[in-house]
Swiss-Prot record:
The protein's name in its UniProt record: Glycine-N-acyltransferase-like protein 3
Organism of derivation: Mus musculus (Mouse)
The protein's enzyme class: transferase
GO CC term, one of those recorded: mitochondrion
Record's keyword annotation contains Transferase: yes
TM ranges: none
Length: 290
């Protein structure tokens, strides 16, 4: 096991991961953020360098953690050989198994392999799997049309940390203190876009997570069918692209409104799927918010 700390090697790794798109996109986004100030206090673990077979990004061990905060306690995985992934987890302390955490990736064997590792280590864990369509936005070469935002309001801008409570209340995965803190950190660290009404309150928004993934795109019910979601998505994609980041996202199979929106802006549905595992030790099973 190797924790890659050298800044030169981390930039080399960033370029190496491009040749493994789209499966490496989650790890690639995390590595890009590490190389640009590392606001989420992540680090890279590999089986070897430079001829690696598996890469895992994780929270730095010295970073402050909350054992119930699976949003922040999230690992991104890319492997060339699934056996190398299993071996790394079985033989080394790559993961903190004593807290609620996530494993994210774009490879189909992730769930079965992670479950096998937990069994081999005799761990009493509940593993919750969610699978999504993975998407990538085409280059947004021009500023999205926002001429319909006439007058001083509504206006296109970005989120502030004070908006985190609204996002926490409206996100299907939110509604708890861990999520509130996580969303506030995302807003503080990464690009966001929102439309605000005449009172300055957000009515439509999108944010970016620790893996440079566009997420939590949402419009309040009273403000739907006005073109806000499309405007927010394209503006956020363009903002990420202008900074050199991939404009990637995920969508549930039954979220037809979002799927139709993505089709309308010519987003590419990737051949791989996004897999999110939430792993909960038995000791936290009644406390965790999934």
């Amino acid at each position: 096991m190797l924790v890659l700390k050298c800044s030169t090697k981390l930039f080399i790794l960033e370029n190496m991961l491009k040749s493994h798109f789209p499966e490496s996109l989650k790890v690639y986004g995390a590595v890009m953020n590490i190389n640009r100030g590392n606001p989420f206090q992540k680090e890279v673990v590999l089986d070897s360098w430079p001829n690696f077979k598996v890469i895992i990004t994780r929270r730095e061990r010295e970073a402050e953690t909350d054992n119930l905060d699976h949003y922040t306690n999230a690992y991104a995985v890319f492997y060339k050989d699934i056996r190398a992934y299993q071996q790394l987890l079985e033989e080394h302390d790559v993961i903190n198994w004593d807290q609620v955490f996530q494993i994210q990736g774009l490879q189909s064997e992730l769930y079965a392999a992670s479950k096998a590792v937990a069994k081999a280590r005799l761990l009493d864990l509940d593993i919750n799997l969610a699978s999504f369509k993975a998407v990538h936005f085409s280059p947004v070469s021009s500023v999205p049309d926002h001429s319909f935002l006439t007058g001083p309001t509504p206006r296109l801008t970005y989120l502030s940390v004070s908006d985190a409570d609204l996002l926490n209340r409206t996100w299907s995965r939110g509604g708890n203190q861990q999520c509130l803190r996580y969303l506030a950190n995302l807003i503080a660290c990464f690009p966001s876009v929102c439309v605000r009404d005449e009172k300055g309150n957000p009515v439509s928004w999108g944010i970016t997570d620790q893996f440079a993934t566009m997420c939590h795109g949402y419009t309040l019910p009273d403000h739907r069918r006005k073109g806000y979601s499309r405007l927010v998505a394209l503006t956020l994609a363009r903002k990420l692209q202008s900074r050199g980041f991939p404009s990637q996202g995920n969508v549930l199979d039954d979220n037809l409104a979002s799927i139709n929106l993505l089709k309308s802006v010519q987003a590419e549905f990737l051949p791989c799927r996004f897999h999110r595992l939430i792993l909960t030790p038995a000791a936290f099973s009644r406390q965790a918010h999934l």
